Amino acid sequence: MSLQLLKALPHLRSATTAVRTQIARTTWSEHIATKVFFSTTTTKPTPSAPPPPPPTQPQQPAATTSWGTKKQNRKVKLRSAAAEFIMSNPEIEAQLAPLRERVQEQGNLVRDLKAKGAPEIDVKKAVAELKARKKLLEDKELALTPSVVSFDRAKMEDLLKRRFFYDQSFAIYGGITGQYDFGPMGCALKSNILALWRQYFALEEQMLEVDCSILTPEPVLKASGHVERFADLMVKDVKTGECFRLDHLIKQALEKLSKAKDATPALQAECEDIIIKLDGLNKQELAGVLAKYNIKSPLTGNDLTEPIEFNLMFATQIGPTGLVKGFLRPETAQGIFVNFKRLLEFNQGKLPFAVAQIGNSFRNEISPRSGLIRVREFTMAEIEHFCDPVLKDHPKFGNIKSEKLTLYSACNQMDGKSAAQVQIGEAVASKLVANETLGYYMARIQQFLLAIGIKPECLRFRQHMSNEMAHYACDCWDAEILTSYGWVECVGCADRSAYDLGQHTAATGVRLVAEKRLPAPKTVEVSEIVPNKQALGKTFKKEAKNITDALAKLSLEEITKVEEQLAGDGQYKLTTADGQSHDLGKDTISVKHSTKTVHVEEFIPSVVEPSFGIGRIMYSLLEHSFQCRDGDEQRCYFTLPPLVAPIKCSILPLSNNTDFQPYTQKLSSALTKAELSHKVDDSSGSIGRRYARTDEIAIPYGITVDFDTLKEPHTVTLRDRNTMKQVRVGLEEVVGVVKDLSTARTTWESVTEQYPLFEQQEASK
């Protein structure tokens, strides 16, 4: 190799790195990567060869991960996130509407000129004008859209992996799709988010906290409806057997179709309308969309099977006999419902009260993707608020009724309108939000998400349409956060009515009810089945107990039916819990009517349930806090708020001078006593490089021990991660300052007003 070439190599490497960085970066002008689809480069076919299938998403081997470092040899197709943000903001949409009309008008003109075979010069002039109008629209979008939505996802994922926030589980064995391990930073971040969640909800609302079993017997989930209804629609490649979740497949195909060069405005509008309403379509309607647009396998171009239902629960066997079937819980809520009676007793029979639970749940996703967004094992933080079904007021609603939320109602979704900012008090008064308790939790959810660092302009509450409502809900709002993947459902807030407690009462015969005292005693008629135990035992032997238990569970309507049948043909057919039927006559049972005076009334409580997906919240927060230094795109960091930052403070001796060690050790001990997580970085690297390393793991503050620290009075510098500014603080004061900053009792702006800004050391040794 020549000397000239050897000298040129460093410059070539730098140039190559710069080009790769530029390619990987995504800005509004280059269309932000809301969804990333990978496709191998295709070669131009020979004239005799059949045309290739449209570009599709190739199958990724299970051994690969989705991290940015694996993407260097793939062609990345980018889709803009601007549209999704703008659609949620009516003020921005109003400003852009005239520009959109001008672009659409010019686009139609270009199509007409081409269709009529107009002179080439006329077409070129029209195209030039179209480009100018599109540029004007894009510039306006860029000016109006927050920078938080625009970022380099591949660069962020590289940083997350390199600093081990989280990584794919069992990576050395090839990894498992949809499963992730949290490293030291990810684990600390998750713990801090959950600690703040407990403070905001469990502590503030004086909730009862439980920790229930993950293994759930089948009868529990049969009663709740999960065995029958907890399924997604799936289609298969008829040749390879590859499985695809149907709604995701349709969305991907229609997005691609609407962005094709020959897509008409009518087709684009049709595709957008279907995508918006996709979650509300049933099996037959989704199959119709599949057939209408002739959607094929995205991996092979092969035909797909008819949609089939796939239950998302992980089945297992409890015990060695294999006779007890169970599931890994799909949600934590059922453990709370089956313990309702004990919890009500613990609360001295009083309503309302709320129960909190944090734990892992499991769903056997058909096609897990998008990192922490869609996984098979995930942490949930759920609340079950039990209240009187006819009195769903909340005592603290007055504290939050003026809170403004961005609400995307079901009506606005159906009419193609944007979300709107509404005071939660007005939303409840107008019945847009069903009741005060639901509205209270929605406002508290917003306060919590903003406190951990979610950007307010990227948060909205979307109401479920009636045909997409969960089987247990009578009203439901999802807190959705805008990320590079689009709007992601992170918190569900549902009014589950009395469904769950009613189902478990019917299945077990255990009355999961509450009581309330009546204003005045009242006389009521009572009907009950009176079994002739002697006759039952003689006739049915060992089955007599099952029959007696089944009779005790009959409702008032069923008792009336028993009486009618006994009066008719003298027989009543009873089905017991084991599925067997028994004919009972007047000699074995009778119906007794009586009256009694009651002072209390029984009722099945309603439940309002906020359910937090911690992994999704974490990922959204990491995106919103990811930044690169101005003028140095290689220096990336996370602006996580001190409240949730994994490590609150770093201690950085200026050099490895042994005189610094006593001060470093003293600071470390003081921070530990103050219960502040911290990291000592006394490595030999330059102080600037060490600052950059601590910024990468989101440490908000750094204490530097320098030569001025050795002088009386002993002082240190305190550095802020976001601004990189430093102040000079007394050695004995600095831990208290960091404590106040980390618990949000003070701000960095207040600290800079109280202490002098640090410019340079006075002493050098």
From Swiss-Prot:
* Result after altering residue 320 to K: When overexpressed in the whole body, leads to motor deficits, progressive neuromuscular junction (NMJ) denervation and pre-synaptic build-up of mutant GlyRS ultimately causing lethality
Tell me what reaction this enzyme catalyses.
2 ATP + H(+) = P(1),P(4)-bis(5'-adenosyl) tetraphosphate + diphosphate; tRNA(Gly) + glycine + ATP = glycyl-tRNA(Gly) + AMP + diphosphate
Protein residues bound to ATP: 363-365, 374-375, 489-490, 616
Enumerate the SUPFAM superfamilies for this protein.
Class II aaRS ABD-related, Class II aaRS and biotin synthetases, S15/NS1 RNA-binding domain
Q: Where is this region: Disordered?
A: 41-73
Checking Pfam families in the record gives: HGTP_anticodon, tRNA-synt_2b, WHEP-TRS
Q: Could you tell me which InterPro entries the record lists for this protein?
A: aa-tRNA-synt_IIb, aa-tRNA-synth_II, aa-tRNA-synth_II/BPL/LPL, Anticodon-bd, Anticodon-bd_dom_sf, Gly-tRNA_synthase/POLG2, GlyRS-like_core, tRNA-synt_gly
* Record-listed E.C. numbers: 6.1.1.14, 2.7.7.-
Q: What does this protein do?
A: Catalyzes the ATP-dependent ligation of glycine to the 3'-end of its cognate tRNA, via the formation of an aminoacyl-adenylate intermediate (Gly-AMP). Also produces diadenosine tetraphosphate (Ap4A), a universal pleiotropic signaling molecule needed for cell regulation pathways, by direct condensation of 2 ATPs. Thereby, may play a special role in Ap4A homeostasis. Required for terminal arborization of both dendrites and axons during development.
Spell out the family assignment given in the record's similarity comment.
Belongs to the class-II aminoacyl-tRNA synthetase family.
What is the name attached to this protein's record?
Answer: Glycine--tRNA ligase
Specify the species: Drosophila melanogaster (Fruit fly)
Gene assigned in the entry: GlyRS
